[in-house]
Curated annotation (Swiss-Prot):
Gene coding for it: orf47
Pfam families reported for this sequence: Phage_capsid (PF05065)
Chief localisation class: virion
Protein source organism: Staphylococcus phage phiMR25
Localisation per UniProt entry: Virion
Functional summary from the UniProt entry: Assembles to form an icosahedral capsid.
Lineage: Viruses, Duplodnaviria, Heunggongvirae, Uroviricota, Caudoviricetes
Signal peptide extent: none
Domain of life: Viruses
Keywords from the named record: Capsid protein, Coiled coil, Late protein, Virion
UniProt-listed InterPro entries: Phage_capsid (IPR024455), Phage_capsid-like_C (IPR054612)
Maturation propeptide residues: 1-14
Protein name: Putative major capsid protein
């Protein structure tokens, strides 16, 4: 009977302290090889920077740094009343006092369909191309949720809901008296307006407002200010022409944990994204892919 000799290998011989683990290189990895994950910081940072520069909430409100999805902080409730912080958390105060509150971040998701050839881009090429589109989708959705309570608002509160609840509304044309009366609604609560939320379609209406005595216009088109206060223009069809919002936006706080998650899908039918004829986009039939991006953000109304 023949015996088979076994070759003894010294595995240590093949090991080397000089061998380094492979490092992910976004310039060499193709998107079809990395269809989901957490976006690298070098792409996350400029996207969030663009979001913060363009979001009306972020232009007007105060930024509160967040390391995780929850942030405890203290603020000065400078008058008795109710303060809303986070989703449905109502804090009642009977006197001016320091209040402890918790701000929680909730996920906002956006879906962007693109042609299938994008899968042949490198990771770097893909996200360089998609950065402005992802940022625009994020800040539009954030503002529509936090200001107008649109798009499955995850925060539980919005400026529109606060207006509806307090019924602090002036109805009528854009006149100097109505603008003054609108600001006076805040002054009744010992608050001062510090900005207006409008839209570009309102500019022609604002330019017609004239002081009946001095004949001066209270809207400055060069500085985009009304009655000396800055005007920011929200791009949303849900804010109608002839609607104008004012407030003390120092009471508005927001936070953004610094993570964006993404996933690419090739087969779904997108019920929220429509073709020109109104039919849902079918990725498989139309030879497209869609990237879904999620990021967490929070809003607190004091």
């Amino acid at each position: 009977m023949e015996q088979t000799q076994k070759l003894k290998l010294n595995l240590q011989h093949f090991a080397s302290n000089n061998v380094k683990p492979q490092v992910f290189n976004p310039d060499n990895v193709m998107m079809h090889e990395k269809k989901d994950g957490t976006l690298m910081n070098e792409f996350t940072t400029p996207i969030l920077q663009e979001v913060m520069e363009n979001s009306k909430i972020m232009q007007l409100g105060k930024y509160e740094p967040m390391e995780g999805t929850e942030k405890k902080f203290t603020f000065w409730a400078d008058k008795p009343g109710a303060y809303w912080v986070g989703e449905g958390q109502k804090i009642e105060t009977s006197k001016a006092t320091w209040v402890n509150a918790t701000m929680r971040a909730f996920k906002l998701g956006v879906i962007l369909p693109v042609t299938k050839e994008f899968l042949n881009y490198t990771y770097s090429q893909f996200f360089e191309e998609m950065k402005p589109m992802i940022a625009e989708a994020f800040y539009k959705k954030f503002d529509e949720a936090g200001i107008l309570n649109q798009g499955n608002n995850p925060f539980g509160k919005s400026i529109a809901q606060s207006i509806e609840k307090t019924n602090k509304v002036i109805k009528g044309d854009f006149t100097q008296d109505n603008i003054i009366d609108l600001e006076a609604l805040l002054e009744d609560d010992e608050l001062e307006a510090n900005a207006f939320i409008s839209k570009t379609q309102n500019r022609s209406l604002l330019r017609k407002i004239v002081d009946p005595e001095t004949k001066e216009r209270i809207y400055d088109r060069n500085s985009d200010s009304l009655d000396g206060l800055p005007v920011v223009n929200l791009k949303s069809s849900n804010l109608k022409r002839g609607e104008l919002i004012t407030g003390d936006f120092d009471k508005l706080i927001y936070g953004i944990p610094q993570l964006i998650e993404y996933k690419i899908d090739e087969t779904a039918q997108l019920s929220t994204v429509k073709n020109e004829d109104g039919t849902p986009v079918n990725l498989f039939e139309q030879d497209m892919v869609a990237i879904t991006c999620n990021y967490a953000c929070s809003i607190a109304y004091r």
